[in-house]
């Protein structure tokens, strides 16, 4: 991520990575190899359309039919996103949970959250104590109602109280479940992480993730730049990609901005 001067700026940068998470990917896809390359494809397509004004995804299976983008260009760009983790495998073995990352807090924000957490814990303890008391009283009433020699008037009175306690317990169960689900916690947002071992991507022949071709070093679209970025081994290269996209010498980004401004003139 970009350098940041404040905790708030750091949090905003993390939230911004949610752009790569959003989309219509089938995260329950049974073929996980296909799921992975589909996610990479979607992230690349979003980036291409939003910032470069080009449908790069058309070159996934072959050289672009209209724009000057080769299949090699596609996989050079795709490599930047290969090292980005969007979904992950849970402890239950389900590889379909979207990444939710914790956001940093200022001291004031943390103090405010601590206050809310204490108030929530106190309320939850009170609700559970009320439920326990209601359960205990209902059990006592059930035992009394088992007596065969209870006067009719007394039985009616005890039955009414027992039924009221049963309703009360159901209500408290719902309140406790709701309170536990919406408990205050560390602020979170959908976002992405770099994988432990990022790297270049192999060409998938005709888009088939199980038919692999040669490895293509990460790089930019040759139509706009022939430069090869220097990427640290433990990083995905998204930082270098962002620098290239926003660079003064990138004619594609400039064209997109001009067209958007012209649209509003």
Language-model regions, residue ranges each:
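Low-complexity, Lys/Gly-biased intrinsically disordered segments
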Residues: 1-10, 209
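Short amphipathic alpha-helical surface patches that mediate protein-protein
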Residues: 1-2, 82, 263
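Short, functional "switch" segments adjacent to catalytic/cofactor/reactive centers
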Residues: 11-12, 17-23, 88-265
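General structural signal for alpha-helix termini and helix-helix connectors
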Residues: 3, 60-64, 147, 247
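Sequence context surrounding c-type heme c attachment/ligation sites in exported
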Residues: 6-111, 118
């Amino acid at each position: 991520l970009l350098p940041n001067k404040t905790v708030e700026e750091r949090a905003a940068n993390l939230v911004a990575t949610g752009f790569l998470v959003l989309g219509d990917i089938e995260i329950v896809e049974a073929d996980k190899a296909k799921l992975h390359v589909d996610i990479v494809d979607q992230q690349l397509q979003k980036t291409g359309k939003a910032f470069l004004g080009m449908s790069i995804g058309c070159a996934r299976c072959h050289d672009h039919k209209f724009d000057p983008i080769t299949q090699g260009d596609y996989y050079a760009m795709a490599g930047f996103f290969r090292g980005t983790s969007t979904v992950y495998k849970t402890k239950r073995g389900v590889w379909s949970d979207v990444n939710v990352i914790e956001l940093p807090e200022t001291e004031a924000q943390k103090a405010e959250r601590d206050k809310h957490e204490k108030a929530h814990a106190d309320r939850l303890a009170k609700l559970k104590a009320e439920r326990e008391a209601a359960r205990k009283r209902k059990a006592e009433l059930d035992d009394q109602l088992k007596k065969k020699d209870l006067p009719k008037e007394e039985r009616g009175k005890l039955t009414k109280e027992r039924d009221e306690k049963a309703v009360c317990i159901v209500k408290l169960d719902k309140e406790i479940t709701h309170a536990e689900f919406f408990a205050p916690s560390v602020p979170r947002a959908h976002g992405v992480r770099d994988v432990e071992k990022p790297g270049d991507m192999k060409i998938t022949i005709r888009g088939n993730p199980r038919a692999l071709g040669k490895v293509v070093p990460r790089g930019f679209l040759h139509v706009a730049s022939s430069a090869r970025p220097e990427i640290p081994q433990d990083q995905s290269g998204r930082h270098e990609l962002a620098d290239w996209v926003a660079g003064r010498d990138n004619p594609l980004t400039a064209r997109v901005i001009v067209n958007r401004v012209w649209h509003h003139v």
